[in-house]
């Protein structure tokens, strides 16, 4: 079985919240795709409830695209501690951390239920499992800790 980089990361050494560049892969025509670890909470210490994580996921899908070019996908980790962000091209962790911070500031602040895309039976595979209240509370907590552009040394972005 192929080795998966994320499973070789020593989860006891990282300091969440952070943005980590996992890898840059180049396609046959030279196109670069970058995979980021957006770790919102400390692994093996806490996990975001599914309704809150689901709502954060739906909001980040649009908010990150508004804040940076080349977003392909932002999907939650099964462990519920953060997200994979896949982008076209090469972006640095500071740029991504700033986009994430700005997105979470919107979620924690002015976001209203109407801002959450894909919350109906025809637009979501589990539309009843959302909580804007939970998403807001998690966003506030994450922001209060600061988002680092480095997983091992706290380099909190402004």
UniProtKB/Swiss-Prot annotation:
Positions with a binding annotation for Fe cation: 54, 58, 124
Which reactions does this protein catalyse? S-(5-deoxy-D-ribos-5-yl)-L-homocysteine = (S)-4,5-dihydroxypentane-2,3-dione + L-homocysteine
**What's the record's note on cofactor binding?**
Binds 1 Fe cation per subunit.
Which InterPro entries would you find in this protein's record? LuxS_sf, Metalloenz_LuxS/M16, S-ribosylhomocysteinase
Q: Which cofactor does it need?
A: Fe cation
Report TM segments: none
Keywords noted in UniProt: Autoinducer synthesis, Iron, Lyase, Metal-binding, Quorum sensing
- E.C. code: 4.4.1.21
The UniProt entry's GO biological process terms, in alphabetical order, are: quorum sensing
GO molecular function, a single term: S-ribosylhomocysteine lyase activity
Q: Which domain of life is it from?
A: Bacteria
Positions the record marks as coiled coil are none
The subunit field of the Swiss-Prot or TrEMBL record says: Homodimer.
The record's family statement is: Belongs to the LuxS family.
User: What does it do?
Assistant: Involved in the synthesis of autoinducer 2 (AI-2) which is secreted by bacteria and is used to communicate both the cell density and the metabolic potential of the environment. The regulation of gene expression in response to changes in cell density is called quorum sensing. Catalyzes the transformation of S-ribosylhomocysteine (RHC) to homocysteine (HC) and 4,5-dihydroxy-2,3-pentadione (DPD).
Question: Under which name does UniProt file this protein?
Answer: S-ribosylhomocysteine lyase
Q: Which organism is it from?
A: Lactiplantibacillus plantarum (strain ATCC BAA-793 / NCIMB 8826 / WCFS1) (Lactobacillus plantarum)
């Amino acid at each position: 079985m192929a080795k998966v980089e994320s499973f070789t990361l020593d989860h006891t050494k990282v300091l969440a919240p952070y943005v980590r560049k996992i890898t840059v892969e180049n396609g046959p025509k030279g196109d670069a795709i970058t995979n980021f670890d957006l770790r919102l909470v400390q692994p093996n210490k806490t996990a975001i409830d599914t309704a809150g994580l689901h709502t954060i996921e739906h909001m980040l899908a649009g908010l990150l695209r508004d804040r940076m070019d080349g977003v392909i996908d932002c999907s939650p980790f099964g462990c519920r501690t953060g997200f994979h962000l896949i982008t076209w091209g090469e972006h640095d962790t500071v740029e991504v951390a700033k986009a994430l911070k700005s997105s979470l500031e919107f979620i924690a602040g002015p976001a209203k239920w109407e801002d959450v895309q894909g919350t109906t039976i025809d637009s979501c595979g589990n539309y009843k499992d959302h909580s804007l209240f939970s998403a807001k509370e998690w966003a506030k907590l994450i922001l209060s800790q600061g988002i680092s552009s480095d997983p091992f040394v706290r380099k909190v972005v402004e």
